[in-house]
Amino acid sequence: SVVKSEDYALPSYVDRRDYPLPDVAHVRHLSASQKALKEKEKASWSSLSMDEKVELYRIQFKESFAEMNRGSNEWKTVVGAAMFFIGFTAILIILEKRYVYGPLPHTFDKEWVAMQTKRMLDLKVNPVDGLASKWDYDKKEWKK
């Protein structure tokens, strides 16, 4: 069978808050009871019951403004998916640190850093603006 494509040049129905009156009614093909109700609508509206007024509204519109403004629960799905991917990434990082990367080099030890700093001070590395400029060589302590 062949599927009939939608002609987008024709007016269409859409429920949007910024476009409150769509070009066409929500229900395009009326049943016999809906046609009778539309005929009754042409008379005085005071003779219509509340249910008939609601039915007339539902023929014209799919949702009311309250229904359009009602929040959805989509944010829960988004937050859940984000937390899943954050957790998955954290597990990958933990596994990489444990099984892929080796131990830190010995140059990261506090003793090694202290020896390297003392060596840089002894060599007077960058005496104008750098490390050696902040060291008092007479008192053997950092300048205050």
Curated annotation (Swiss-Prot):
> What pathway is it annotated to?
Energy metabolism; oxidative phosphorylation
What compartments host this protein?
Answer: Mitochondrion inner membrane
Alphabetized, the UniProt keywords read: Acetylation, Membrane, Mitochondrion, Mitochondrion inner membrane, Phosphoprotein, Transmembrane, Transmembrane helix
Note the subunit structure. Answer: Component of the cytochrome c oxidase (complex IV, CIV), a multisubunit enzyme composed of 14 subunits. The complex is composed of a catalytic core of 3 subunits MT-CO1, MT-CO2 and MT-CO3, encoded in the mitochondrial DNA, and 11 supernumerary subunits COX4I, COX5A, COX5B, COX6A, COX6B, COX6C, COX7A, COX7B, COX7C, COX8 and NDUFA4, which are encoded in the nuclear genome.
Pfam families in the cross-refs: COX4
Membrane side Mitochondrial intermembrane: which residues?
100-144
Regarding protein family, the annotation reads: Belongs to the cytochrome c oxidase IV family.
Q: Name one GO biological process term.
A: mitochondrial electron transport, cytochrome c to oxygen
| Species in which this protein is naturally found | Aotus azarae
Q: Which residues carry this modification: N6-succinyllysine?
A: K4, K35
Q: How would you describe this protein's topology in the membrane? A: Single-pass membrane protein
Name the record gives this protein? Cytochrome c oxidase subunit 4 isoform 1, mitochondrial
A GO cellular component annotation here is: respiratory chain complex IV
Membrane topology, Mitochondrial matrix segments: 1-73
Matches recorded under PANTHER family: CYTOCHROME C OXIDASE SUBUNIT 4 ISOFORM 1, MITOCHONDRIAL, CYTOCHROME C OXIDASE SUBUNIT IV
Membrane-crossing segments per the record: 74-99
> Modified residue Phosphoserine is at which positions?
S31, S33
PTM N6-acetyllysine: at which residues? Answer: K4, K35, K42
* Reported function: Component of the cytochrome c oxidase, the last enzyme in the mitochondrial electron transport chain which drives oxidative phosphorylation. The respiratory chain contains 3 multisubunit complexes succinate dehydrogenase (complex II, CII), ubiquinol-cytochrome c oxidoreductase (cytochrome b-c1 complex, complex III, CIII) and cytochrome c oxidase (complex IV, CIV), that cooperate to transfer electrons derived from NADH and succinate to molecular oxygen, creating an electrochemical gradient over the inner membrane that drives transmembrane transport and the ATP synthase.
Which top-rank group of organisms is this from?
Answer: Eukaryota
Does the keyword Transferase feature in the UniProt annotation? no
